[in-house]
């Protein structure tokens, strides 16, 4: 399997990397969050820009990014506009979604960009090309807040993401039972054994919390923890998360 190196973080080896979302609505709130995150043991910061109140002004988005980067100069930043259809805060046109992501990837000031799988393939490929030209890695994602698809479907989506050029394919699904969590873990194990790229998977809510902890066993390269406000159901406090990941890593 290829390793994916972003600044001082290597995906695809050792314990899953911890990503903590920033969900501030204003520049002031984001600066406060970034300063707090400086004090926390994390690997990646995800800027959930769909929470940012000036997201439609691209100059203001870049200015906010500059403020975050000043406070967190060495921390990998994952730039994510989560669409409303995949559980995000704001509904926007497909045109704006791609304009925003291409513009910010084109600055080279972010380290990773989230690209949702279920969009026009030509748009997705163009965004991946822009990202890679600017040394920005692509987390290609899919989120199902209603259910856990069949194992074959989860495997198919992750495999398709890699085929399209994702550096880190990602899927998050909602369990209705413990069996659904096993389905997600089984799919993760199957894909990670044959994939060229590290993958990121999770089963959400309380039922799925084991999937956020067991990535090193089953093959998920990153997990999401909450420092302030969880951006998805089931995210664990980042300090507790690190403790458990370290414990499992020592035994593995």
UniProtKB/Swiss-Prot annotation:
Entries under PROSITE patterns matching the protein: DEHYDROQUINASE_I
Known catalytic reactions: 3-dehydroquinate = 3-dehydroshikimate + H2O
The enzyme's E.C. designation: 4.2.1.10
Gene Ontology MF terms in the entry: 3-dehydroquinate dehydratase activity
Main EC class the enzyme belongs to: lyase
SUPFAM superfamilies named among the record's database cross-references: Aldolase
Keywords annotated in UniProt: Amino-acid biosynthesis, Aromatic amino acid biosynthesis, Lyase, Schiff base
Pfam families listed in its UniProt record: DHquinase_I
GO biological process annotation, one example: 3,4-dihydroxybenzoate biosynthetic process
Active site: 143 (proton donor/acceptor), 170 (schiff-base intermediate with substrate)
Binding site for 3-dehydroquinate: 46-48, 82, 212, 231, 235
Pathway note: Metabolic intermediate biosynthesis; chorismate biosynthesis; chorismate from D-erythrose 4-phosphate and phosphoenolpyruvate: step 3/7
Record note on quaternary structure: Homodimer.
Family according to the record: Belongs to the type-I 3-dehydroquinase family.
Function noted in UniProt: Involved in the third step of the chorismate pathway, which leads to the biosynthesis of aromatic amino acids. Catalyzes the cis-dehydration of 3-dehydroquinate (DHQ) and introduces the first double bond of the aromatic ring to yield 3-dehydroshikimate.
UniProt cross-references to HAMAP family, sorted A to Z: AroD
Protein name: 3-dehydroquinate dehydratase
């Amino acid at each position: 399997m290829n390793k994916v190196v972003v600044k001082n973080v290597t995906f695809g080896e050792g314990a899953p990397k911890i990503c903590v979302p920033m969900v501030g609505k204003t520049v002031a709130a984001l600066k406060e969050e970034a300063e707090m995150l400086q004090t926390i043991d994390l690997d990646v910061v995800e800027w959930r820009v769909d929470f940012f109140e000036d997201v439609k002004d691209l100059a203001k988005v870049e200015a906010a990014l500059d403020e975050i980067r000043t406070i967190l100069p060495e921390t990998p930043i994952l730039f994510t506009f989560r669409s409303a259809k995949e559980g995000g805060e704001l509904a926007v046109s497909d045109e704006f979604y791609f304009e925003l992501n291409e513009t910010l990837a084109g600055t080279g000031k972010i380290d990773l960009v989230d690209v949702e799988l279920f969009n026009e393939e030509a748009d997705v490929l163009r965004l991946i090309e822009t990202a890679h030209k600017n040394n920005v890695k692509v987390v290609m994602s899919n989120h199902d807040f209603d259910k856990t698809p069949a194992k074959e479907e989860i495997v198919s989506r992750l495999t398709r993401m890699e085929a399209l050029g994702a550096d880190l394919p990602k899927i998050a699904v909602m369990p209705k039972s413990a069996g659904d969590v096993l389905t997600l873990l089984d799919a993760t194990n199957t894909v990670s054994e044959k994939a060229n790229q590290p993958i990121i998977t999770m089963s959400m809510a309380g039922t799925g919390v084991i999937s956020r902890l067991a990535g090193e066993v089953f093959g998920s390269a990153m997990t999401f923890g909450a420092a302030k406000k969880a951006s998805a159901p089931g995210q664990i406090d980042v300090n507790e998360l690190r403790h458990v990941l370290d414990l499992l890593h020592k035994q593995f």
